[in-house]
Amino acid sequence: MERKKAGEEMLNAGILLEMIKELEQEAELHSICVLEEGKTVFEGAWAPYSLRVPQMMHSLSKTGTSLCVGMAVSEGKLFLDDYMLDYLRDELPVTYDTTLEKITIRDLLTMQAGSTFCANNVWFTRLTKDWETTWLGQKRNADEIGNGFHYDSGCSYTLSVIVSKVMGKTCLELLKERVFSKMDLPEINWLSSPEGYNTGGWGMYLTAPWIAALGWLIKQNGMWNGEQLVSAEWISDMVKPRVQIPEAAGHAIDSYGYQVKTGEKIFAAEGAFGQFMIGFREIPVVIGITSGTASEKIADICQKYILKAVEAPKSTEEERTALRKKEADLCLPMPDGEDVPEELYWKVKG
């Protein structure tokens, strides 16, 4: 992304530096990209990590799934009140919980499919075949279909399967053709099941700048360089709070939309171990973060400082210089421990 010119930044550099420092205390940051009005105001990676090497996303990948559902809905090939099994009869096991008949596309999007556990990447990758059939064979909580939030990446994989069936292309193929290529993003990979469907809920490979760019696409209601890549109506619906996340009250992120998390002031995509896309509803700012430490406080910290930074006076030259110096010197600390004796070093090294 283009760099914002010095002196034109809206965000106060001193407060932005405070945010970076507090994030470092809270999480093992790997990389970050802060965009203001679609232009970079801070980006970097903590050595030995690099902005040029994509990392595997966990649930942040669900953003891509939601964008693809939006494409199918916009073309009239999928409707949110359709029943899931309208598209999956050929995937059903011989015996199954008949409460599956009640689950809609909307329920899958909002994690209200009556799941009794989270079928995550570990659960799925233990299977050598029949991912969808196996997931459909699990017991459901009938009373909570459509009215109880239970996070389950199986919902996301199922959406990926359904989109592929109705669109005739995988989610990755759709994104490459309609989104990534138009944004000049390089080759992006996404893991697939043995059946050839993208995993939906995890497995997309991104860098912090690419995360921020996708966040900016959402912030711009699906518009990129004057071209509508994804329906503005869908983007608006996607980031609306739909269901309260249990035990999240008081945090910047407290609700769930369509495969993304939401709050009063921000929308967000979050992946395990501190992967974040954070977009501000009323401020033209988006942040992409990768890290190695799970922490729900990351979004809280970003919201706190960005709201302060936009209200603060213009940055001084001293503040800008300090921020640039920090950007140039990012490095993870060496782990604690005693020096290895030389003879042991050579023994291990061989």
Task: Give the residues covered by each predicted segment.
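Active-site helix/loop module of the DD-peptidase/beta-lactamase fold
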Residues: E75-A113, V166-W202, L206
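Catalytic-site signature segments of enzymes, centered on catalytic residues
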Residues: L51-R52, C118-M204
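A short, well-structured edge-of-sheet supersecondary motif
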Residues: E18-S50, I278, P284-G288
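Active-site-proximal loop and beta-strand segments within enzyme catalytic domains
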Residues: R3-K4, E9, G14-K21, P54, ...
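Active-site Gly/Thr loop motif
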Residues: I235-V286
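Short, gly/Ser/Thr-rich active-site loops of penicillin-recognizing serine hydrolases
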Residues: K297-G350
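Active-site-proximal alpha-helical segments within enzyme catalytic domains
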Residues: C155-I162, G200-M223, Q275-G292
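Active-site SXXK
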Residues: G38, M56-D81, L108, L159-V163, ...
